[in-house]
Swiss-Prot record:
Residues 594-823, 1224-1477 form the ABC transporter domain. ABC-type transporter; part of the gene cluster that mediates the biosynthesis of the brasilane terpene glycosides brasilane D and E. It comes from Annulohypoxylon truncatum (Hypoxylon truncatum). This is ABC-type transporter braE. Keywords: ATP-binding, Glycoprotein, Membrane, Nucleotide-binding, Repeat, Transmembrane, Transmembrane helix, Transport. GO terms for molecular function: ABC-type transporter activity; ATP binding; ATP hydrolysis activity.
Length: 1481
């Protein structure tokens, strides 16, 4: 035995309390040796080699030799003292036991390990050693307790000597702790990147979150922007994590494991997953000290004699230690856990994006990755937050059950039975949660996908008059989504009820079963054990559904990641791909640039689109591919790019460069400047840039654009005309350093003059591509350029090659090419074109306008409402609920607060009556009322949950979405040209997700915790009225903390939401343009951009999580202060043991309630930020409807179709410029309210009278104002105020007509066709308004020659996939939609199916992507179906214009000529005549 003073006591037992010695207020020596010395030292010794091995591989980045020398000196001294203790134990007559010697030896070994660990950690790590500091901190507390024991137990000289050396070692450990805590920031050899102060923070700085102080001060005093935030810790960076994660996920994919994604995460993040465990164990230990402390204190207070001073100070010291350790261990646990979550987010988001770049081009849902990256990852993070609670709660339940058994005997089985029933109930309902969540996520995915499509195509939707049916479709998806979500939330609510049963019903059931004398000590100790059992069970049962949801979302992501990716089947000859620096020139020169042998390609394995192709494309040639619509021209382009999912035969590519220039039929443009879109990720070359701008004739357009080539083109290039989009896409293709270019119908939106000039400058004999000796594959409907081709390929409708060869040979074959009637240009014409080409080659005709780009301020930075919040958001949310629901919610919260807290007071009366000589009431009386109170608490909680999670959520969700969608639909076109698509998409995804999920949860928890907290404060004060005196000061401090915290928290939450918008936009852009990105070889750069955007979005989100943990820590410190005050008052004033027990038991959860009130109030405030953003959206996107638009014409309007424009002018700039920035947050959303002094006019002084039934064609070069004229007639573009009433239709001022009604009455077909989401039926797409019969739809499809196609796909009710339709078929489908509208209108007006008295048809390049035969068929349909309509058609096909009554030629927004097209062609010097001749007619 080490000490002999207490030889006759239980000092050599495990105790843990010593009896008969040291005032019975100490641990036994054996317990201290085992738990305070031996166990920590053994753990440290086992873990140290692993840490040292990890550090040895890292580079040396810290100097500071003096600090390192000081550390080593102290450690050597400490090791010497430990050695001295071991010698004393073994040499002197202590009578030491084996555990004493082992404990001392392990302490010495641990000291030696500390020397090596400190040396390497000092040099290799930028932060103080977390592992060593944690060991020093906790063992220091243990050593202080042991030192006290040793001094009290020492009675002989050897014992005193041993204790003195132990105390000296303790002093050395304190010195070492202080030295090891020193930050090494000024000695770290950083790289060039900025670093966060977190990266140099030690465990103490991390534990109290002092590294966040600067952020809090900044957030309190100013409005934060992204630039004000700390840089992201490099260990959380996407590039740092993704490389390791991709290796593990690829390995899991090869093995085909069902939980491969979870395995990959575990292998990648195993160290971050382990780090929370020690802190969690420390927290569990400190939790279980609370009931022991309550038992000891109430036992002392129930005795008649006063509490001795030293024991009273011991109780106070114990309360300080217990609650301080709880605060620090909890903060460290959640710190490491939050870091883990954001590492998981980085891994998953990067993997999803990478898979998006590898996905097949034919994948139907391009928005799937966006939903997975946003909604699914958020739910995974929410569920994974509690992963360590799973095993931690099991330990807590087991320990509390064992302690309860020691106190109450077999009665401990009662709560276990309750727990088993609840676990069974939760397990039963969890079986349905996976499918329920998948249905809900699928509903969100459908709605967000459609909304994103609507945002990107709003102009065409408005032109088509489809705003109302599409709004109804989106709202139906929203209702379906909320219904699916309600089913899931109902399951969650049911599981939550089961989770609260142990907390509320276990105590009355347990006490009822015990039926023994229960004094205050037993009653409140038992209650504390039950609380320790039921609280983790409640957490466990509540979090199990969230964990199940996280697993389901991981399954969805794994399915996506394991989906079949693109398989590039092409064969690249040496030099073209593998070694671009050293091409095999001889081999390349002898082989064709592209060769297809026995090639068959298809989008589905059972149906090939292209069949039996044998094609060779000569090097340096211009190969033109022609054929009727749906012959496979676009599919051939995809086949050459390796993008067809199913292929047979071989495709061989032999080029010098690894990248391929590609122009898609639908131009892919990102939201940025024209220059950025042209250059992409290529290095800037001014000469090359000027060359391609001149070749595509964009210089002329730059002169009319407000910022020239730095003009922002908006999402999908919405600010550009169709021809401008095509030419920007062509310029990007030409700018790329490539010798193989594949172009799909790049002339579809160009007028004849521009088309001819672009062709000569780019493809002509001395054009850009000829000079570069590039190989060009050009698929086109513009057959007049075929004579210029080196090689021609003609495809048939069955996907085979009809003929191929030179133009002359094919004309002589008397086959398809001959049937087109195209003639080779005359010698004089060819010479003229050559001279033109030569001139342009010598002197590029371009004058690049170097204008300084407009500085767009970081909007919102000076928005003071970001500091104080938006109180109006509460009103909006309450209004969305209705009148009675808020009252019902408040009432249910009040009832729950009472019924939750009063049972604790009831136990005080029960315990007092139980020990009374003459009890006032029986056991059953108290037990029954106690049970009724708890059942009432349960019922009020259920009521509150149903109100908020089901009723309120559904009602407000529908209402707020309807308001936001209405704002979106009625927003002016200018709004969509100045606002990034990702920002608006974020409103309908992230913000509505907040309103659906976080907002109801935050509101419920605030109501729940406020009323419970008020009751708990009253219960705590019941032990001593003096404690209540401190409440004003405590609550004042809480108010200051909340105010201080909330300013920063609210801003970080808003920044979190805002920083995700660019990430979402980038995901959408990548999904839409992946074929182009892969062809250009830009995928790696695009992934780097995604990593940057992801890291940027992580910064506010991660810091928000950290400051929430700071708040937890501060409030736990407040609880510690209350505990110390309560203990001090109890032992000094001899408080009632029952009320003291009730106060201490309540205090066990009071900290959580305090934290919860502030945390969830902040969550409520920041979640209401979503509503503020919707309010700001409503304000910024002011409705396009203006005062005075009060005329709703009758159904038959316009009966005649007469249009009069009387000197009208219009400007896009004249509308209020709404520069909606990424900070779409508050009512003070910045917008530029100043009108430009001289707005650029899109239309100038137009004078035009279109007679009823007249057929008018509009032509002119691209950007001349043709589409703007269509927009003017549909009120997408408003006249300037001076000419507001200068447009009339059938004698009705256009300015007075309701816009929605106007677009429904006028039938219009846009250039870009709008379809419902994939999976919608052909019938729904043809008739979104659902007013026709199947027979009507079939008749229309037969009229436009699409019925056979639809029938082959399964008929009208079959699901439709837009990618299965060629561009020409899409335009035919759109024409069919217009024909159906005309027929339904005629029938509703009683005019029969053959025609109507009048109407207006507007056509915007409806035949730009079809061949001549199809175009003639379309014009015949228009002539027959709309013979009595007034037709205004924008067209570049001049031969079709000849059939119109009149042609209007436009230039720079003005009408420069009008007249009969045939007469204008004959007259010399006319503009139309020039266009006619240029067009090769």
């Amino acid at each position: 035995m080490l000490f002999s003073a207490c030889a006759d006591t239980n000092d050599q037992s495990l105790g843990p309390n010593v009896l008969g010695c040291r005032g019975d207020f100490d641990f036994t020596v054996k317990f201290e040796q085992l738990c305070f010395s031996l166990t920590p030292a053994a753990i440290f010794i086992l873990a140290s080699p692993w840490r040292v091995a990890h550090l040895v591989r890292k580079p040396t980045i810290v100097g500071a030799p003096l600090l390192r020398l000081a550390k080593l000196g102290v450690l050597v001294s400490y090791a010497s003292l430990e050695l001295s203790q071991l010698i004393l134990i073994t040499v002197l007559p202590f009578g030491a036991s084996g555990i004493d010697i082992i404990s001392s030896a392990l302490r010495l070994a641990a000291a030696l390990c500390m020397v090596g660990l400190s040396y390497f950690d000092h040099s290799k790590s930028p932060r103080p050693s977390i592992f060593l500091s944690a060991y020093l901190f906790f063992t220091l507390l243990f050593d202080i307790a042991q030192a006290r024991t040793y001094w009290l137990a020492s009675s002989t000289r050897p014992e005193i000597a041993f204790t003195a050396i132990f105390t000296a070692a303790l002093a050395m450990k304190i010195a070492m702790l202080l030295l090891e805590a020193q930050r090494k920031t000024k000695w770290v050899a950083w790289d060039s990147k900025d670093h966060s102060p977190e990266e140099t923070s030690g465990i103490y700085t991390l534990g109290v979150f002092s590294w966040l102080n600067k952020l809090f001060f900044d957030g309190y005093h100013k409005t934060l922007g992204i630039r004000d935030l700390y840089p992201l810790d490099q260990n959380l960076a996407a590039t740092h994590l993704s490389e390791r994660f991709s290796r593990h996920i690829n390995e899991a994919k090869r093995k085909g494991h069902e939980i491969g994604l979870m395995e990959a995460l575990a292998k990648t993040l195993y160290v971050p997953m382990i780090l929370p465990i020690p802190a969690k164990l420390a927290a569990i230990g400190s939790f279980f000290c609370q009931p022991l402390f309550i038992s000891s204190l109430t036992s002392r207070l129930s005795q008649s004699e006063p509490v001795p001073a030293n024991i009273g100070y011991g109780f106070i010291g114990a309360s300080i230690c217990i609650y301080s350790v709880i605060a620090i261990s909890q903060s460290l646990y959640w710190y490491f856990q939050q870091r883990l979550l954001y590492m998981m987010r980085a891994c998953l988001a990067t993997a999803i994006y990478t898979k998006t770049t590898e996905a097949r081009a034919a994948d139907e849902d391009e928005n799937a990755s966006l939903t997975l990256m946003s909604i699914d990852i958020e739910r995974i993070m929410k569920g994974s937050l509690y992963m360590h609670e799973l095993w931690g709660n099991v330990i807590e339940v087991a320990l509390s059950a064992w302690l309860l058994y020691n106190l109450l005997g077999v009665a401990f089985i009662a709560p276990i039975v309750v727990v088993c029933i609840c676990v069974g109930g939760v397990s039963f309902f969890m079986r349905f949660m996976g499918d329920s969540q998948r249905n809900w996520m699928a509903g969100i995915q459908k709605r967000v996908g459609l909304t994103s499509s609507v945002i990107g195509n709003m102009k065409n939707i408005k032109i088509s008059g489809l705003t109302s049916p599409i709004s109804r479709f989106v709202e139906k998806l929203r209702v379906d989504e909320l219904q699916a979500g309600s089913n899931f939330r109902l399951l969650m609510l049911t599981c939550s009820v089961f989770a609260y049963i142990p907390l509320l019903l276990s105590p009355p059931i347990t006490f009822g079963v015990a039926r023994r004398s229960l004094d205050a000590t037993k009653l409140f100790t038992s209650l504390s054990y039950l609380l320790l059992m039921s609280t983790p069970l409640q957490n466990l049962l509540e979090t199990l559904p969230q964990m199940a949801a996280a697993v389901a979302c991981l399954g969805r992501i794994q399915k996506f990641l394991q989906g079949e990716g693109r398989d590039d089947y092409r064969i690249f000859l040496a030099g073209s791909r593998r070694d671009p620096e050293k091409p095999s020139l001889d081999q390349l020169d002898k082989s064709p640039a592209v060769a297809i042998k026995d090639g068959s390609f298809g989008w589905k394995p059972d149906k090939m689109v292209l069949n039996n192709l044998d094609v060779e494309i000569p090097r340096g040639s211009l190969t033109i591919v022609v054929g009727p619509i749906a012959s496979g021209k676009s599919s051939l382009c995809k086949a050459l790019l390796g993008e067809m999912p199913h292929s047979q035969g071989t495709v061989t590519i032999a080029t010098k460069f690894s990248c391929v220039g590609y122009c898609d039929q639908t131009p892919f443009l990102s939201n940025g400047s024209i220059r950025d879109n042209i250059i992409g990720y290529s290095p800037f070359d001014a000469q090359r840039y000027a060359e391609v701008v001149d070749g595509t004739m964009l210089g002329i357009d730059f002169e009319t654009l407000p910022e020239a080539d730095r003009t922002n083109i908006g999402s999908n290039g919405i600010t550009l005309s169709g021809g401008q989009k095509q030419r920007v896409s062509l310029a990007r293709c030409l700018y790329l350093q490539s010798d193989l270019l594949i172009m799909d119908d790049v002339f579809s939106g160009l007028d004849a003059d521009t088309e001819d000039q672009v062709f000569q400058r780019v493809f002509g004999a001395n054009g850009i591509l000829k000079r570069r000796q590039a190989t060009v594959v050009l698929c086109t409907h513009s057959v007049r350029h075929i004579p210029s081709a080196t090689h021609v390929i003609a495809l048939s409708t069955d996907g085979t090659v009809v003929e191929q060869g030179t133009f002359g040979d094919l004309v002589a074959n008397q086959s398809y090419i001959h049937s087109l009637g195209v003639k080779a240009p005359s010698t004089s014409q060819a010479d003229s074109e050559k001279i033109e080409s030569d001139d342009s080659a010598i002197e590029p005709q371009i004058n690049l306008i170097e204008r300084a780009p407009t500085e767009t301020p970081e909007v919102g930075v000076n928005d003071k409402s970001r500091l104080s919040g938006d109180s109006a958001a509460y009103i909006v949310y309450m209004k969305s609920m209705g009148t009675m629901l808020p009252i019902a919610i408040f009432t249910s919260g009040l009832l729950y607060g009472f019924f939750y807290n009063f049972p604790t007071i009831w136990l005080t009366y029960w315990s007092a009556d139980a020990v009374a000589t003459n009890p006032s009431h029986s056991f059953g009386y108290y037990a029954a009322i106690y049970a009724v109170l708890e059942v009432c608490a349960m019922l009020s909680l259920i009521w509150l949950g149903v109100l908020l999670y089901i009723t309120v959520l559904t009602r407000s969700g529908v209402s707020l979405h309807h308001a936001a969608l209405r704002t979106l639909i009625h927003a002016p076109l200018r709004f969509f040209t100045t606002t990034d698509q990702g920002i608006i998409t974020n409103l309908f995804s992230q913000d509505l997700s907040l309103i659906d999920n976080e907002l109801p949860s935050a509101l419920l928890n605030v109501i729940y915790m406020v009323f419970v907290g008020i009751g708990q404060a009253a219960v705590i004060a019941s032990s001593s009225p003096y404690l209540a005196i401190s409440y004003p000061f405590l609550f004042g401090m809480l108010y200051v903390v909340q105010k201080f915290y909330l300013r920063t928290s609210r801003q970080l939450r808003l920044l979190d939401l805002e920083a995700k918008s660019p990430l979402y936009t980038h995901f959408l852009d990548t999904s839409k343009g992946i074929v182009t990105l892969r062809a250009f070889g830009f995928v790696s750069e695009d992934r780097a951009k995604n990593a940057f955007l992801l890291d940027t979005s992580q910064r506010p989100a991660y810091l928000l999580a950290m400051i929430q943990q700071w708040l937890h820590f501060v409030l736990n410190v407040v609880v510690a202060i209350i505990a110390v005050m309560l203990t001090s008052l109890a032992v000094r004033l001899r408080s009632n043991s029952g009320f003291t027990g009730a106060s201490l038991v309540t205090l066990m959860s009071f900290g959580e309630m305090l934290s919860g009130v502030v945390i969830y109030y902040t969550a409520l405030e920041t979640s209401l930020g979503a509503i503020s953003r919707l309010k700001a959206f409503d304000k910024a996107a002011k409705t396009e409807t203006k005062d005075g638009e009060d005329i709703v014409p009758p159904e038959e309007w316009p009966p005649r179709g007469e249009i009069i424009l009387n000197n009208v002018s219009a400007s896009y700039e004249y509308e209020l410029p709404l520069f909606l920035s990424i900070r779409l947050t508050t009512n003070e959303l910045s917008s530029n309210d100043t009108q430009p002094e001289t707005p650029t006019l899109a239309l100038k002084n137009l004078r035009l009278r279109i007679r009823p039934g007249e057929k008018i064609a509009i032509c002119g070069r691209t950007g001349s104002g043709k589409s703007s004229l269509i927009s003017l007639l549909l009120k997408l573009l408003d006249p300037i105020d001076e000419t507001l009433d200068c447009v009339n239709i059938d004698n009705t001022p256009l300015s007075r007509i309701d816009r929605v009604t106007l677009r429904q009455r006028i039938i219009a077909i846009p250039q870009d066709i709008v379809f419902l989401p994939d999976g919608s039926t052909f019938q729904e797409n043809l008739d979104p308004s659902n007013v026709s019969t199947a027979a009507d739809a079939q008749a229309v499809l037969e009229a436009v020659d699409l019925w056979d196609f639809v029938r082959d796909k399964g008929g009208l009710e079959a699901g439709m996939t837009v990618s299965n339709l060629s561009q020409g078929q899409r335009q035919l489908f759109s024409l069919g939609r217009a024909v159906l509208r005309r027929r339904i209108r005629a029938r509703s007006l009683g005019l029969g199916g053959g025609g109507s008295e009048g109407g207006i048809l507007l056509l915007d390049e409806v035949s730009s992507s079809v061949d001549r035969e199809t175009e003639k068929a379309m014009q015949e349909v228009i002539r027959v179906e709309f013979r009595e309509y007034t037709v205004v058609a924008v067209s570049h096909r001049l031969d079709i214009i000849m059939d119109y009554d009149r042609v209007v030629v436009m230039e720079k927004g003005e009408i420069v000529e009008e007249g009969n097209p045939a007469r204008l062609v004959e007259e010399p010097g006319t503009r139309f005549g020039e266009l006619w001749s240029v067009g090769g007619n």
